[in-house]
């Protein structure tokens, strides 16, 4: 099940943790959940500035100090900034954020693994035996023949798209599918996404997808 209590996304300073304090029993429960969520991408967040967006009436100065100390020690962030979560921002818990995006201008070859805590756009191919993992969307401007894991942090809105979608395996938010033995190349770009907990693949339609 998707955890909508804390949402992590990129921003111009580094990373932004949007926290819905209404869904936590107390501060310590929230802190444990935040540390657990950030720990999954610790190597990406090291040295980053973290902006914590939440309803500040739930957190006092002592707790703010504790949160900073824990995150400095365990996640190795560089700085921590707090900002008030406005009412209009509540929509983030049901909406989709693109977050930060990385462009990779190379082919992912057999035995290589590409991992990123955001969206990945690969200008090249993903060969058989190659592996790509991303917290967000994975877009391959070429042939996708290896393994791709999108929404690797539980993002059920992530998609996988490629000019030619012939994967060994694709996964979105932990849901996995493999190409059938009688798979036939379509000759047009396709998009894989989740629909009612199942991965479906459909032709790419520019008017339908506006990521």
UniProtKB/Swiss-Prot annotation:
The keyword Methyltransferase does not apply. Signal peptide: none annotated. InterPro entries: CAP/MinC_C, MinC, MinC_C_sf, MinC_N_1, Septum_form_inhib_MinC_C. GO terms for biological process: cell morphogenesis; division septum assembly; regulation of cell septum assembly. Keywords: Cell cycle, Cell division, Septation. Pfam families: MinC_C, MinC_N_1. It comes from the Bacteria. Belongs to the MinC family. Cell division inhibitor that blocks the formation of polar Z ring septums. Rapidly oscillates between the poles of the cell to destabilize FtsZ filaments that have formed before they mature into polar Z rings. Prevents FtsZ polymerization. Interacts with MinD and FtsZ. This is Probable septum site-determining protein MinC.
């Amino acid at each position: 099940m998707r955890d909508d209590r804390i949402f992590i996304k990129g921003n111009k300073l580094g990373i932004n943790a949007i926290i819905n304090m209404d869904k936590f029993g107390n501060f310590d429960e929230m802190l444990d959940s935040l540390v657990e969520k950030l720990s999954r991408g610790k190597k990406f967040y090291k040295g980053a500035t973290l902006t914590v967006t939440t309803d500040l009436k739930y957190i006092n100065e002592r707790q703010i100090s504790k949160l900073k100390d824990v995150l400095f020690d365990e996640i190795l962030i560089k700085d921590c900034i707090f900002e008030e979560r406005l009412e209009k921002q509540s929509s983030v818990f049901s909406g989709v954020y693109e977050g930060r995006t990385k462009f990779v201008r190379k082919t992912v070859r057999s035995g290589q693994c590409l991992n990123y805590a955001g969206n990945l756009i690969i200008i090249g191919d993903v060969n058989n035996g190659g592996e790509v993992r991303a917290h967000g969307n994975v877009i391959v401007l070429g042939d996708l023949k290896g393994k791709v894991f999108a929404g690797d942090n539980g993002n059920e809105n992530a998609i996988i798209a490629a000019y030619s979608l012939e994967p060994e395996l694709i996964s979105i938010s932990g849901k996995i599918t493999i190409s059938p033995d009688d798979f036939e190349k379509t000759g047009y770009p396709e998009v894989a996404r989740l629909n009612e907990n199942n991965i479906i693949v459909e032709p790419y339609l520019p008017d339908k997808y506006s990521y």
